């Protein structure tokens, strides 16, 4: 799987909302770029391994491979809630020092929790940590009705903080009008329109990867 040469060494996968498909997109990038994966804060789904376990399965990693390429979360919180609320339920406060980027050799994919402005604690938004990391963002959004408002608001928030955006991944049934509107108004490329995958996993990702538009490439 090529195209890795045009991608930055490290990047953040963020979303316009929760449950927009960040984990599937992260897994696609981990497989396509042969990258390491890190989700700093996991809220809920601990019994099934959380998103880290899901990425390992989607990428097709053995247990031995996953131990080297799926990094442990800084926070594993039981409640399926925003990080500030999930941490408070356990008597914890999320500390920035624990969210420092890990040192890895090779590409790194960092998956955020929820949307850009979700609070990690009451005085620390997730987008602030993205700014501290100084990494570019792949923004995952829904493809259908409502995505223009959510996506343009997210792009505005990123631009306001000077955070570079590599491009968008639109998750769901392709919607040509929304794609063209976002590229024209948001002035960012759509890297991929990702339709629902019947069986997400290595074979599906390998079939999709050639359609991914590497950052900086013309359509």
Spans of features found by a protein language model:
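N-terminal phosphate/diphosphate-binding loop that engages ATP/GTP or pyrophosphate donors
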Residues: 4-10, 24-93, 98, 102
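C-terminal lobe/tail of nucleotide-utilizing enzymes
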Residues: 4-5, 156-219
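Conserved glycine(s) of the Walker
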Residues: 20-21
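Switch II (G3) loop of P-loop NTPases
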Residues: 99-121
């Amino acid at each position: 799987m090529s195209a890795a040469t045009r991608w930055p060494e490290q990047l953040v996968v963020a979303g316009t909302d929760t449950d927009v498909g960040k984990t599937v997109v992260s897994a696609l990038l981990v497989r396509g770029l042969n990258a390491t994966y890190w989700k700093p804060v996991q809220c809920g789904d601990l019994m099934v391994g959380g998103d880290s376990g899901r990425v390992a399965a989607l990428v097709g990693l053995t247990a031995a491979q996953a131990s080297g390429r799926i990094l442990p979360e800084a926070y594993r919180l039981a409640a399926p809630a925003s990080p500030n609320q999930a941490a408070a339920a356990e008597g914890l406060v999320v500390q920035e020092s624990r969210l420092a980027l890990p040192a890895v050799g090779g590409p790194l994919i960092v998956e955020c929790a929820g949307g850009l402005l979700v609070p990690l604690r009451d005085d620390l938004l997730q987008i602030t940590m993205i700014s501290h990391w100084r990494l570019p963002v792949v923004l995952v959004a829904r493809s259908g009705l409502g995505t223009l408002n959510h996506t343009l608001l997210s792009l505005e928030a990123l631009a306001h903080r000077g955070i570079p955006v590599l491009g968008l991944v639109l998750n769901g049934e392709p919607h040509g009008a929304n794609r063209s509107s976002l590229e024209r108004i948001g002035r960012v490329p759509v890297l991929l329109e990702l339709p629902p995958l019947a069986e997400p996993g290595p074979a599906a990702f390998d079939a999709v990867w050639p359609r991914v538009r590497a950052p900086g490439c013309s359509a």
